[in-house]
Amino acid sequence: MFAFFRRPLFKRARLFLLCAGLFSKCRLKPLFNPLETHCAMKPHTLTLCLLLTAAAVYLCCGIGFGAWESPLAMDETVRQIRLPRIYTALLVGAGLSASGAALQALFENPLADPSLIGTSGGAALGVIVLLALGGGTIGVPTAAFFGALGVCLLILAVHKLLGGGTLGLLVLGFVLSAFSGAVVSMILFLSDDLVLRSATTWLSGSLAEAGFSSPVAAIAVMLPGFLILLSAGRRLDVLMTGEDTASSMGVSVGALRVQTVIGAALMTGAAVSLSGIIGFLGMMIPNVLAQTVGGSRRKLIALSAWLGAVFLMVVDGAARWLTYPVDLPVGIVIALLGGPFFMYLFIKPLKSR
């Protein structure tokens, strides 16, 4: 079957035409003028088509455009390099984006992100401490979960004590991230373990290797977290109207906060154990969907997981192609994209005053 890839480039271009046919049902005009027509595809179906198309292109297109040397070599490349990188990108993108959507509702702040408020840093700290103590890699997702959970609970308590506010949340997240990063750096500096020293690339947000965790272990941690966040979606909508209103409607605010924090910590911890810290992704995807698609928080969490998976896979593939032969960590690229987006979200409310 891989003899197809030995054909010239113009013949391989048929793949792109086939993938483009997936979108034939959907008219893209409503993206620019939604009053004139409508999209025949539901958001979940459209995102699934995007996911399948991106995965097909990622699998079937090489770094370069030369002919493949042998089908067996192509088979090994797909199985040993591209497939692991694809499912790592999908899991990490889904985990960070869904947890970001939930945290934004919990803190009632569109700037909330697993990396910005220190959750990702706490997860990374949990992983490094486990490895430094001689723990096995099978417990990495669990250690990442407890690290993220501890930071989330601390932020929730202090944020409530200070009375909320965007600036207070960001300052608190910055302090916790800096503290976690300092402890991680100290452990890595004092360690002679080769595994710990290899964490430098992992911490930069690289998908070149599946981190210190296996995808199966990460899924086992991430799936319960995703279900927990989905079950909290409708009550998060009520919480965003105000704590007093939510309490009067029978919502246990305290239990909802703990549930959301646990779900977000599970997903963030599993994602960080695979890829290290990737900032801004959990902030960008939910905000883009909230401004374009809208809907309930439950729907936003689900769509954020879908779109986050697609987006991270596409960005990683584009970064590899543009910087070849250097394998640029995708976390660096996401940070370059997310920085201006963060400034836009931060300045926008100030300009409207």
Q: Where do the model's predicted regions map?
A:
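Short, Lys/Arg-enriched N-terminal segments with co-localized hydrophobic residues
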Residues: F32-A40
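Positively charged N-terminal leader segments that act as targeting/secretion signals
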Residues: F4-L15, C26, T37
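Compositionally biased, low-complexity peptide segments typical
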Residues: R27-L31
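Alpha-helical transmembrane segments in inner-membrane proteins
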Residues: A40-R353
